[in-house]
């Protein structure tokens, strides 16, 4: 089923109902369908041909959504760019993807006449040729191209097909949001270029209303939750923490809210408990990655007595834990998380060697270290590349970070390994705080909470921690800062 078919069927069923809103502007299902037709037709009229890549860097807004689905209807491939990235980042991705056109304020195409700013986009949406835009696309052909967040190195283009898109929608409607329908409202507080965008089509095709916030502010988010009577929303853990800090950790009066979905980065158990207290039994954690978007495992609202788990596999995903030889390990044993199913990427753009390595044996090798318990719940320990080996023992930074975040004064934490002559690597931590701390007292506080080899030797206090454009703390950048500091002291 083509994207255009999904939009047209929704327009036929829910015609004049509100489909999408942002600020004072609302489009009905029919209006949204026709707007995406005009935009798709306009792009084809500019000389683009099906299969061409179109780079898009747009803020949350209705025109951005029209661009995404107009591009899809025209058989073009959307290259998703994050507006928080730099112009240099955008240029690198545009060059790497071979994009012929670009839409946004901080992007430019190699073909000047195919560079469109926000005003150009608005004009194409209004003045584009009327009529159905429906270019067929093979299920395995590229549908969109996303770039990994860059937390583990150079970002790579991830090719997602219509097959993957359908599997993601099906996963949500079967497992995460089976009861949505007309009268429901999804509040998008996170960028729709990121994980929140995954929730748009499932709500649209069921006749629900998608409401977008142009940007995230915790006070505005809480007001909008109540004003629109949101039934569902999505937050990354950083946004969740900001919201709870703003609300003062008191239970929130949002009776229509049935799902607070979260994911996209690890969450500390202490933060999940705070969120459960504030929002009630509506939390749903969804685990995925760029190569298998947001639909590997799910921790349902009624399973949050297992805070710390990433949940159980979605219906559309087969998940195993394997050793270094790709052999499945026994229940309870630790290894790499691998995934198989229709949700998977087709591969990395122009990177056949990395594609073969990551998708070997038809399984996506996630690079995440985890284990299953006897009830089939997955527990993620860390990223393979982030494991610290100190004195021959494996230290999982996430475990240490989660423990640090239990301290009431600590707001953010990153734990990394620093080269050490005796231990191979020494455990060090960087934190940002809500109030001043004495680092020696915090290190003493960790005694009894962590084994000696896991405890940081040094605790650094910084105003803020480096993050990716998606809000993930960049351990790689933290590690480099500390190593540069050590080298600077040694060279002084």
Predicted regions and their residues:
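Conserved AMP-binding/adenylate-forming core of the ANL superfamily
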Residues: 3, 8, 16-61, 65-69, ...
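Conserved adenylate-forming
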Residues: 43-48, 132-140, 145-187, 203-208
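A short helix-loop-beta submotif of the ANL/AMP-binding
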Residues: 53, 59-79, 83-87, 96-101, ...
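ATP-dependent adenylate-forming carboxylate-activation enzymes
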Residues: 58, 79-92, 106-108, 208-228, ...
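AMP-binding/adenylate-forming catalytic core of the ANL superfamily
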Residues: 85, 102, 233, 325, ...
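ANL superfamily adenylate-forming
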Residues: 107-139, 149, 154-155, 166, ...
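Conserved AMP-binding/adenylation subdomain of ANL enzymes
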Residues: 166-185, 193-232, 246
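Gly/Ser/Thr-rich phosphate-binding loop
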Residues: 205, 230-235, 244-305, 318
């Amino acid at each position: 089923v083509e994207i255009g078919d999904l939009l047209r069927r929704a327009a036929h069923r829910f015609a004049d109902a509100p489909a999408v809103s942002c600020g004072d502007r609302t489009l009905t299902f029919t209006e949204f369908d026709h707007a995406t037709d005009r935009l798709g037709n306009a792009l084809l009229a500019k000389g683009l041909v099906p299969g061409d890549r179109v780079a898009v860097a747009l803020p949350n807004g209705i025109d951005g959504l029209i661009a995404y689905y107009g591009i899809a209807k025209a058989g073009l491939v959307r290259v998703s760019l994050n507006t928080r990235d730099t112009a240099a980042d955008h240029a690198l991705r545009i060059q790497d993807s071979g994009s012929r056109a670009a839409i946004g304020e901080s992007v430019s195409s190699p073909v000047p006449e195919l560079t469109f700013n926000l005003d150009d986009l608005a004009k194409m949406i209004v003045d584009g040729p009327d009529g159905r835009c429906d270019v067929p696309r093979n299920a395995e052909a590229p549908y969109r191209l996303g770039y990994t967040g860059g937390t583990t190195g150079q970002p790579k283009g991830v090719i997602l097909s219509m097959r993957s898109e359908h599997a993601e929608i099906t996963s949500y409607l079967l497992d995460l949001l089976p009861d949505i329908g007309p009268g429901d409202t999804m509040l998008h507080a996170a960028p729709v270029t990121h994980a929140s965008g995954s929730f748009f089509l499932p709500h649209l095709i069921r006749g629900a209303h998608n409401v977008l916030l142009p940007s995230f502010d915790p006070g505005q988010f809480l007001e909008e939750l109540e004003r629109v009577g949101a039934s569902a929303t999505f937050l990354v853990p950083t946004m969740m923490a900001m919201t709870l800090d703003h609300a003062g950790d008191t239970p929130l009066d949002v009776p229509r809210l049935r799902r607070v979905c979260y994911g996209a980065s690890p969450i500390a158990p202490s933060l999940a408990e705070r969120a459960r207290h504030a929002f009630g039994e509506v939390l749903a954690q969804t685990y995925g990655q760029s190569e298998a978007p947001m639909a590997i495992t799910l921790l349902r609202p009624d399973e949050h007595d297992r805070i710390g788990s990433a949940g159980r596999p979605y219906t559309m995903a087969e998940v195993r834990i394997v050793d270094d030889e790709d052999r499945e390990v026994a229940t309870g044993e630790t290894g790499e998380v691998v995934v198989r199913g229709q949700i998977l990427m087709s591969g990395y753009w122009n990177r056949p060697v990395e594609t073969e390595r990551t998708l070997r044996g038809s399984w996506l090798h996630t690079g995440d270290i985890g284990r299953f318990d006897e009830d089939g719940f997955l527990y993620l320990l860390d990223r393979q590349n982030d494991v610290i080996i100190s004195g021959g023992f494996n230290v999982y930074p996430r475990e240490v970070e989660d423990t640090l975040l239990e301290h009431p004064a600590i707001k953010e934490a990153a734990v990394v390994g620093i080269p050490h002559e005796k231990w191979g690597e020494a455990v060090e931590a960087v934190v940002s705080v809500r109030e001043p701390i004495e680092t020696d007292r915090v290190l003493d506080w960790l005694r009894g909470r962590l084994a000696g080899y896991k405890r940081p030797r040094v605790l650094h206090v910084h105003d803020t921690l480096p993050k990716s454009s998606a809000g993930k703390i960049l351990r790689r950048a933290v590690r480099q800062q500390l190593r540069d500091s050590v080298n600077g002291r040694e060279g002084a």
